[in-house]
Protein backbone atom coordinates (compact mmCIF):
# COMPACT_ATOMS: atom_id res chain seq x y z
CA UNK A 1 0.00 0.00 0.00
CA UNK A 2 1.43 3.30 -1.03
CA UNK A 3 1.49 6.07 1.53
CA UNK A 4 0.77 9.45 -0.01
CA UNK A 5 1.99 12.86 1.11
CA UNK A 6 0.12 15.10 3.52
CA UNK A 7 -2.91 16.94 2.21
CA UNK A 8 -5.11 19.79 3.41
CA UNK A 9 -2.22 21.62 5.10
CA UNK A 10 -2.76 25.01 6.70
CA UNK A 11 -0.21 27.47 8.04
CA UNK A 12 -1.58 29.75 10.77
CA UNK A 13 0.24 33.01 11.47
CA UNK A 14 -0.65 35.18 14.46
CA UNK A 15 -0.19 38.85 13.62
CA UNK A 16 -1.08 42.17 15.19
CA UNK A 17 -2.32 45.13 13.22
CA UNK A 18 -1.04 48.57 14.06
CA UNK A 19 -2.28 51.60 12.18
CA UNK A 20 1.13 53.18 12.04
CA UNK A 21 3.29 50.11 11.46
CA UNK A 22 0.96 47.83 9.51
CA UNK A 23 0.90 44.12 10.36
CA UNK A 24 3.38 43.06 13.03
CA UNK A 25 4.50 39.45 12.97
CA UNK A 26 4.15 38.67 9.26
CA UNK A 27 6.90 36.73 7.52
CA UNK A 28 9.50 39.04 6.07
CA UNK A 29 8.63 38.13 2.46
CA UNK A 30 5.20 39.68 2.93
CA UNK A 31 6.32 42.87 4.61
CA UNK A 32 7.08 44.89 1.44
CA UNK A 33 3.46 44.50 0.36
CA UNK A 34 2.13 46.02 3.60
CA UNK A 35 1.88 49.82 3.64
CA UNK A 36 3.84 51.26 6.54
CA UNK A 37 1.91 54.53 6.76
CA UNK A 38 -1.70 55.56 6.40
CA UNK A 39 -2.21 55.42 2.61
CA UNK A 40 -5.11 57.82 2.11
CA UNK A 41 -7.60 60.17 3.73
CA UNK A 42 -9.68 57.16 4.74
CA UNK A 43 -6.99 56.33 7.31
CA UNK A 44 -6.35 59.91 8.37
CA UNK A 45 -5.58 60.89 11.94
CA UNK A 46 -8.54 63.25 11.80
CA UNK A 47 -12.13 62.08 11.96
CA UNK A 48 -11.39 58.57 13.23
CA UNK A 49 -12.09 56.86 16.52
CA UNK A 50 -9.41 56.88 19.19
CA UNK A 51 -9.61 53.07 19.34
CA UNK A 52 -7.91 52.92 15.93
CA UNK A 53 -5.14 55.36 16.82
CA UNK A 54 -1.79 54.97 18.48
CA UNK A 55 -2.05 56.14 22.08
CA UNK A 56 0.47 57.30 24.63
CA UNK A 57 0.56 58.87 28.10
CA UNK A 58 1.15 62.52 28.83
CA UNK A 59 2.97 63.86 31.88
CA UNK A 60 -0.24 63.71 33.95
CA UNK A 61 -1.09 60.12 33.11
CA UNK A 62 -3.75 60.81 30.47
CA UNK A 63 -3.85 58.19 27.72
CA UNK A 64 -4.41 60.18 24.52
CA UNK A 65 -3.56 59.84 20.81
CA UNK A 66 0.07 60.48 19.96
CA UNK A 67 -0.92 63.07 17.36
CA UNK A 68 -2.26 65.34 20.11
CA UNK A 69 0.95 65.03 22.11
CA UNK A 70 3.02 65.83 19.04
CA UNK A 71 0.93 68.91 18.21
CA UNK A 72 1.05 70.06 21.82
CA UNK A 73 4.81 69.61 22.06
CA UNK A 74 5.38 71.56 18.84
CA UNK A 75 2.98 74.30 19.99
CA UNK A 76 4.85 74.72 23.28
CA UNK A 77 8.29 74.56 21.69
CA UNK A 78 7.42 77.34 19.24
CA UNK A 79 6.14 79.68 21.94
CA UNK A 80 2.47 79.15 21.20
CA UNK A 81 1.46 79.71 24.82
CA UNK A 82 2.70 83.30 24.57
CA UNK A 83 1.07 84.01 21.20
CA UNK A 84 -1.69 86.59 21.46
CA UNK A 85 -5.11 85.13 20.63
CA UNK A 86 -3.88 81.53 20.52
CA UNK A 87 -6.81 79.13 19.83
CA UNK A 88 -8.92 82.16 18.86
CA UNK A 89 -7.06 83.36 15.79
CA UNK A 90 -7.30 80.90 12.89
CA UNK A 91 -4.33 79.95 10.75
CA UNK A 92 -4.01 80.02 6.98
CA UNK A 93 -6.28 77.47 5.28
CA UNK A 94 -3.62 76.51 2.74
CA UNK A 95 -1.05 75.84 5.46
CA UNK A 96 -3.55 73.83 7.49
CA UNK A 97 -4.38 71.59 4.53
CA UNK A 98 -0.69 71.02 3.85
CA UNK A 99 0.00 70.13 7.48
CA UNK A 100 -2.98 67.76 7.49
CA UNK A 101 -1.55 65.86 4.54
CA UNK A 102 1.83 65.61 6.25
CA UNK A 103 0.26 64.42 9.50
CA UNK A 104 -1.60 61.70 7.62
CA UNK A 105 1.80 60.48 6.44
CA UNK A 106 3.14 60.54 9.98
CA UNK A 107 5.22 63.67 9.43
CA UNK A 108 5.11 66.93 11.35
CA UNK A 109 6.76 69.63 9.22
CA UNK A 110 8.95 72.32 10.73
CA UNK A 111 8.11 75.98 10.91
CA UNK A 112 4.35 75.61 11.33
CA UNK A 113 2.53 78.73 12.46
CA UNK A 114 1.39 78.40 16.08
CA UNK A 115 -2.16 79.44 15.18
CA UNK A 116 -2.24 76.63 12.61
CA UNK A 117 -1.14 74.15 15.27
CA UNK A 118 -3.79 75.40 17.69
CA UNK A 119 -6.43 75.22 14.96
CA UNK A 120 -5.51 71.61 14.17
CA UNK A 121 -5.93 70.64 17.82
CA UNK A 122 -9.44 72.10 17.82
CA UNK A 123 -10.18 70.43 14.48
CA UNK A 124 -9.12 67.05 15.84
CA UNK A 125 -11.72 67.28 18.62
CA UNK A 126 -14.35 68.69 16.27
CA UNK A 127 -13.98 65.90 13.70
CA UNK A 128 -14.21 62.97 16.12
CA UNK A 129 -16.98 60.49 15.18
CA UNK A 130 -18.39 61.10 18.65
CA UNK A 131 -17.78 64.22 20.70
CA UNK A 132 -15.84 63.99 23.93
CA UNK A 133 -18.89 65.02 25.98
CA UNK A 134 -21.47 63.10 23.93
CA UNK A 135 -21.49 60.09 26.32
CA UNK A 136 -22.94 62.38 29.02
CA UNK A 137 -26.73 62.75 29.31
CA UNK A 138 -27.44 66.20 27.86
CA UNK A 139 -30.31 66.78 30.31
CA UNK A 140 -28.01 66.18 33.26
CA UNK A 141 -25.39 68.52 31.84
CA UNK A 142 -27.99 71.26 31.32
CA UNK A 143 -29.07 70.97 34.96
CA UNK A 144 -25.59 71.66 36.32
CA UNK A 145 -25.34 74.98 38.12
CA UNK A 146 -22.32 74.84 40.42
CA UNK A 147 -18.70 73.75 40.15
CA UNK A 148 -19.51 70.66 42.20
CA UNK A 149 -22.27 69.74 39.74
CA UNK A 150 -19.86 69.91 36.81
CA UNK A 151 -17.27 67.83 38.66
CA UNK A 152 -19.86 65.16 39.43
CA UNK A 153 -21.22 64.96 35.90
CA UNK A 154 -17.83 64.56 34.19
CA UNK A 155 -17.14 61.58 36.44
CA UNK A 156 -19.72 59.73 34.35
CA UNK A 157 -17.47 59.84 31.28
CA UNK A 158 -15.80 56.64 30.03
CA UNK A 159 -12.05 56.36 30.54
CA UNK A 160 -11.11 57.39 26.99
CA UNK A 161 -13.29 60.50 26.91
CA UNK A 162 -12.30 61.39 30.48
CA UNK A 163 -8.61 61.32 29.52
CA UNK A 164 -9.25 63.49 26.46
CA UNK A 165 -11.23 66.02 28.48
CA UNK A 166 -8.59 66.14 31.22
CA UNK A 167 -5.89 66.65 28.60
CA UNK A 168 -7.83 69.53 27.03
CA UNK A 169 -8.52 71.15 30.42
CA UNK A 170 -4.83 71.07 31.35
CA UNK A 171 -3.96 72.47 27.94
CA UNK A 172 -6.28 75.42 28.56
CA UNK A 173 -4.84 75.84 32.07
CA UNK A 174 -1.35 76.06 30.55
CA UNK A 175 -2.55 78.81 28.22
CA UNK A 176 -4.15 80.76 31.08
CA UNK A 177 -0.82 80.91 32.89
CA UNK A 178 0.29 83.36 30.16
CA UNK A 179 -2.99 85.29 30.06
CA UNK A 180 -1.15 88.59 30.55
CA UNK A 181 0.63 87.96 27.25
CA UNK A 182 -1.79 85.95 25.06
CA UNK A 183 -4.97 87.75 26.25
CA UNK A 184 -6.76 84.40 26.59
CA UNK A 185 -8.60 83.88 29.88
CA UNK A 186 -10.73 80.93 30.96
CA UNK A 187 -13.89 82.35 29.39
CA UNK A 188 -12.27 83.00 26.01
CA UNK A 189 -10.77 79.51 25.87
CA UNK A 190 -14.01 77.83 26.95
CA UNK A 191 -15.82 79.83 24.28
CA UNK A 192 -13.61 78.56 21.44
CA UNK A 193 -13.39 74.94 22.68
CA UNK A 194 -17.05 74.37 23.61
CA UNK A 195 -18.41 73.90 20.04
CA UNK A 196 -15.76 71.21 19.41
CA UNK A 197 -16.66 69.01 22.39
CA UNK A 198 -20.10 67.77 21.34
CA UNK A 199 -22.15 67.07 18.23
CA UNK A 200 -25.86 67.71 17.86
CA UNK A 201 -28.01 67.62 14.75
CA UNK A 202 -30.30 70.50 15.68
CA UNK A 203 -28.40 73.83 15.39
CA UNK A 204 -30.54 75.58 18.01
CA UNK A 205 -30.14 72.76 20.53
CA UNK A 206 -26.44 72.60 19.74
CA UNK A 207 -26.10 76.32 20.43
CA UNK A 208 -27.87 76.12 23.79
CA UNK A 209 -25.88 73.06 24.75
CA UNK A 210 -22.61 74.74 23.72
CA UNK A 211 -23.34 77.58 26.15
CA UNK A 212 -23.64 75.07 29.00
CA UNK A 213 -20.53 73.24 27.82
CA UNK A 214 -18.70 76.56 27.86
CA UNK A 215 -19.65 76.99 31.52
CA UNK A 216 -18.48 73.45 32.23
CA UNK A 217 -15.10 73.98 30.56
CA UNK A 218 -14.64 77.36 32.25
CA UNK A 219 -15.45 75.88 35.66
CA UNK A 220 -13.12 72.91 35.28
CA UNK A 221 -10.28 75.04 33.90
CA UNK A 222 -10.48 77.55 36.74
CA UNK A 223 -10.61 74.69 39.23
CA UNK A 224 -7.44 73.22 37.71
CA UNK A 225 -5.69 76.59 37.88
CA UNK A 226 -6.66 77.01 41.55
CA UNK A 227 -5.39 73.53 42.36
CA UNK A 228 -2.09 74.30 40.66
CA UNK A 229 -1.72 77.54 42.58
CA UNK A 230 -2.56 75.81 45.85
CA UNK A 231 -0.08 73.05 45.12
CA UNK A 232 2.56 75.59 44.15
CA UNK A 233 1.97 77.61 47.34
CA UNK A 234 2.24 74.43 49.40
CA UNK A 235 5.53 73.62 47.71
CA UNK A 236 6.73 77.19 48.25
CA UNK A 237 5.76 77.07 51.92
CA UNK A 238 7.46 73.72 52.28
CA UNK A 239 10.61 75.03 50.64
CA UNK A 240 10.45 78.17 52.78
CA UNK A 241 9.99 76.09 55.93
CA UNK A 242 12.87 73.85 54.95
CA UNK A 243 15.00 76.93 54.35
CA UNK A 244 14.00 78.37 57.74
CA UNK A 245 14.69 75.06 59.43
CA UNK A 246 18.04 74.96 57.69
CA UNK A 247 18.85 78.48 58.92
CA UNK A 248 17.75 77.59 62.45
CA UNK A 249 19.80 74.42 62.37
CA UNK A 250 22.75 76.39 61.10
CA UNK A 251 22.31 78.98 63.87
CA UNK A 252 22.01 76.22 66.45
CA UNK A 253 25.16 74.61 65.15
CA UNK A 254 26.96 77.95 65.33
CA UNK A 255 25.69 78.48 68.89
CA UNK A 256 26.82 75.00 69.85
CA UNK A 257 30.21 75.67 68.29
CA UNK A 258 30.45 78.97 70.20
CA UNK A 259 29.49 77.22 73.44
CA UNK A 260 32.05 74.51 72.79
CA UNK A 261 34.70 77.14 72.12
CA UNK A 262 33.76 78.96 75.35
CA UNK A 263 33.90 75.70 77.28
CA UNK A 264 37.29 74.93 75.76
CA UNK A 265 38.53 78.41 76.72
CA UNK A 266 37.21 77.96 80.27
CA UNK A 267 38.90 74.58 80.49
CA UNK A 268 42.14 76.14 79.29
CA UNK A 269 41.82 78.91 81.90
CA UNK A 270 41.19 76.35 84.64
CA UNK A 271 44.20 74.36 83.49
CA UNK A 272 46.30 77.50 83.60
CA UNK A 273 45.04 78.31 87.12
CA UNK A 274 45.82 74.80 88.29
CA UNK A 275 49.18 75.08 86.68
CA UNK A 276 49.76 78.39 88.47
CA UNK A 277 48.76 76.90 91.82
CA UNK A 278 51.31 74.16 91.31
CA UNK A 279 53.99 76.71 90.60
CA UNK A 280 53.00 78.68 93.68
CA UNK A 281 53.15 75.57 95.84
CA UNK A 282 56.55 74.74 94.51
CA UNK A 283 57.76 78.25 95.23
CA UNK A 284 56.26 78.09 98.71
CA UNK A 285 58.13 74.87 99.43
CA UNK A 286 61.29 76.43 98.10
CA UNK A 287 60.67 79.46 100.28
CA UNK A 288 60.16 77.24 103.33
CA UNK A 289 63.40 75.50 102.63
CA UNK A 290 65.12 78.82 102.15
CA UNK A 291 63.62 80.14 105.39
CA UNK A 292 64.78 77.01 107.19
CA UNK A 293 68.24 77.32 105.73
CA UNK A 294 68.34 80.99 106.62
CA UNK A 295 67.11 80.22 110.14
CA UNK A 296 69.75 77.59 110.48
CA UNK A 297 72.28 80.01 109.18
CA UNK A 298 71.06 82.67 111.59
CA UNK A 299 71.13 80.18 114.44
CA UNK A 300 74.60 79.03 113.65
CA UNK A 301 75.58 82.63 113.15
CA UNK A 302 74.32 83.66 116.58
CA UNK A 303 76.14 80.80 118.22
CA UNK A 304 79.25 81.76 116.37
CA UNK A 305 78.81 85.36 117.45
CA UNK A 306 78.43 84.37 121.06
CA UNK A 307 81.41 82.09 120.74
CA UNK A 308 83.45 84.81 119.11
CA UNK A 309 82.27 87.37 121.62
CA UNK A 310 83.46 85.25 124.51
CA UNK A 311 87.07 85.25 123.24
CA UNK A 312 89.40 88.09 124.16
CA UNK A 313 91.27 87.97 120.92
CA UNK A 314 91.09 86.06 117.72
CA UNK A 315 94.08 83.82 117.55
CA UNK A 316 94.87 81.99 114.47
CA UNK A 317 97.46 79.49 113.94
CA UNK A 318 99.64 79.24 111.00
CA UNK A 319 97.00 77.36 109.19
CA UNK A 320 94.50 80.04 109.88
CA UNK A 321 92.56 77.86 112.29
CA UNK A 322 90.89 79.68 115.07
CA UNK A 323 92.68 78.97 118.28
CA UNK A 324 90.87 78.64 121.55
CA UNK A 325 91.32 81.56 123.92
CA UNK A 326 94.19 81.45 126.41
CA UNK A 327 92.93 81.68 129.91
CA UNK A 328 95.02 83.81 132.21
CA UNK A 329 95.55 82.80 135.80
CA UNK A 330 94.46 85.11 138.61
CA UNK A 331 97.22 86.71 140.53
UniProtKB/Swiss-Prot annotation:
Stretches the record annotates as Disordered: 227-331
Chief location: membrane
Compositionally biased residues, Acidic residues: 252-277
SUPFAM superfamilies: GTPase activation domain, GAP (SSF48350)
GO BP annotation list: signal transduction
Compartment(s) of residence: Cell membrane
GO molecular function ontology, one term from the record: GTPase activator activity
Tissue: Expressed in differentiating xylem cells.
One Pfam family hit: RhoGAP
Single GO cellular component term: plasma membrane
Topology class, membrane: Peripheral membrane protein
Residue numbers marked as site, Arginine finger: 88
Ranges of biased composition (kind: Basic and acidic residues): 227-251
InterPro entries xrefs: CRIB_dom, CRIB_dom_sf, Rho_GTPase_activation_prot, RhoGAP_dom, RopGAP1-5
Domain called Rho-GAP: residue spans: 48-225
Keywords: Cell membrane, GTPase activation, Membrane
Domain spans labelled CRIB: 3-16
Protein task: Acts as a GTPase activator for the Rac-type GTPase by converting it to an inactive GDP-bound state.
Protein name: Rho GTPase-activating protein 5
UniProt organism field: Arabidopsis thaliana (Mouse-ear cress)
Protein's gene: ROPGAP5
Amino acid sequence: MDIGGPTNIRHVAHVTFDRFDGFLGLPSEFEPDVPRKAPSASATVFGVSTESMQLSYDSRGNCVPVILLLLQSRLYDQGGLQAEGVFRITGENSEEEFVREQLNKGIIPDGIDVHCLAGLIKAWFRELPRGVLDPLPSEQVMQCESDEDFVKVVRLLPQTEASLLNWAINLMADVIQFEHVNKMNSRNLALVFAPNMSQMADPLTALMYAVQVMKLLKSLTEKTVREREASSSVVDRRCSKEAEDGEKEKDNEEEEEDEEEEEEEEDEDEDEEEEGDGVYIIKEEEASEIIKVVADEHKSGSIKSEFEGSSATDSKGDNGVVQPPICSSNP
